[in-house]
Amino acid sequence: MLSAALRRRVLAPTHSALRTGFAAHVVRHYASFPEHQVIKMPALSPTMQAGNIGAWQKKPGDSIAPGDVLVEIETDKAQMDFEFQEEGVIAKILKDAGEKDIPVGSPIAVLVEEGTDISAFEKFSIEDAGGDAAKPAAPKKEEKSESKSESASAPEPTPEPQQYQSQGRLQTALDRLPNISASAKRLAREKGISIDGLKGTGKNGQITEEDVKKAISSPAASSAPSATYEDIPISGMRKTIANRLVESTQTNPHFYVTSSISVSKLLKLRQALNSSADGKYKLSVNDFLIKAIAVASRKVPQVNSSWRDGNIRQFNNVDVSVAVSTPTGLITPIVTGVEGRGLEAISSQVKSLAKKARDGKLKPEEYQGGTISISNMGMNPAVDHFTAVINPPQAAILAVGTTKKVAIPAENEAGVEFDDQITLTASFDHKVVDGAVGAEWLKELKQVLENPLELLL
């Protein structure tokens, strides 16, 4: 019973992955408790070392059936669902919703057979489940030596690392925030009063509105008001974005090539195609750009490559990672096989992936990989042009600015006419792409965008 298998909406694992990986997350126990199984924090992505507990979909006493979602887990990549494929009853929740940085392998819940008395697990603890898994290795801090008077006494056991000493439980960043009521916090922010060091007179030492008022009236507060700020917790996705971009800027020697592209013909073609679509599709400028990237990459394949240990991998297919801004951060879903797709298919795929990204429902195979990227900020009229950071291990990314009306010479009475232009800036990894190759790729991109009928061939 309950050889539980893991299935996620975001990625259905292979049978071999279930056989080798899931067993580590469900452990059968007997001891002084009725027969039960400990459910542990699973590794829901290849790089996941710890996760945050989201909303529990089951509570103690609830039955769980095949395919039911047990709990939402935030990984270093996205919000994912943790599901079981067999039945049982939840006897105990060991990690509450909102708990953060729980190492993979740590106990999070207890599962029993139908009919088991779950009241027997009322006092079941993490220790009864074998304890939390070790956290990812961190630099060790030097221990301060004991005073001479203490060293003369009998030796004491080696103390645990400081980060685990918090009155018997792990102290999170949220635990270290000042204990302050909402009204007091609001008043302190309005009056520019620092709550650091304020002594609370409320229940359990909570800082009250009255405490803040006293601080406002004190001479120190009136003479030297301190700056106010708010510390915002960092999500798993934010950490991943930060780590990958730091890695990219430190290991990829970027160089940039910029060109102004006339898109007047492209805009007219787009308007004509959309007008004749009868609502079946609505093409965007970005759809044309994605297709143009594939055309240029087939003509200059060195750009559609990545740096690997000992070799440069040049891809035959063009899978374009499209940067999408979501409430939790930037993610790059992939339009695969762009070289073989038409504009309508590209448009449909981009819209579908963007919606999934904003809803947090992308599967890992929909955002992991890609051979080249595009980042479009053209919807913001203030952005003429910008440079983008390469998405490793790719070797190139195209940054797209907004469309501008530019006066150009013309053989008419005024001597000028206005042309719709976009400034494109390509970032290249110089380990993979030489300057002349990058320039050639941008030339091919310019050629096809300024003659957009070629995209229909």
Swiss-Prot record:
GO biological process: aerobic respiration; pyruvate decarboxylation to acetyl-CoA
Coiled coil: none
Record text on cofactor binding: Binds 1 lipoyl cofactor covalently.
An example molecular function term from Gene Ontology annotations: dihydrolipoyllysine-residue acetyltransferase activity
In-chain residues carrying the UniProt-annotated modification N6-crotonyllysine: 148
Known outcome of mutating residue 148 to Q: Abolishes crotonylation. Increases pyruvate dehydrogenase complex activity, cellular ATP content, and conidial germination
Post-translational modification: Decrotonylated at 'Lys-148' by SIR5, which inhibits the activity of the pyruvate dehydrogenase complex (PDC).
Enzyme class: transferase
Keyword entries, A-Z: Acyltransferase, Lipoyl, Mitochondrion, Pyruvate, Transferase, Transit peptide
Basic and acidic residues composition bias: residue spans: 139-149
Cofactor requirement: (R)-lipoate
Localisation per UniProt entry: Mitochondrion matrix
Annotated active site: 430, 434
Domain Lipoyl-binding: 36-112
Transit peptide: 1-30
GO CC annotation, single: pyruvate dehydrogenase complex
Cysteine disulfide partners in this protein: none
Enzyme Commission number(s): 2.3.1.12
Note: The E2 component contains covalently-bound lipoyl cofactors and it participates in the generation of acetyl groups from hydroxyethyl-thiamine pyrophosphate-E1 and their transfer to coenzyme A.
Family as reported in the entry's similarity comment: Belongs to the 2-oxoacid dehydrogenase family.
Subunit structure of this chain's protein: Eukaryotic pyruvate dehydrogenase (PDH) complexes are organized as a core consisting of the oligomeric dihydrolipoamide acetyl-transferase (E2), around which are arranged multiple copies of pyruvate dehydrogenase (E1), dihydrolipoamide dehydrogenase (E3) and protein X (E3BP) bound by non-covalent bonds. Interacts with SIR5; the interaction is direct.
Protein name (database record): Dihydrolipoyllysine-residue acetyltransferase component of pyruvate dehydrogenase complex, mitochondrial
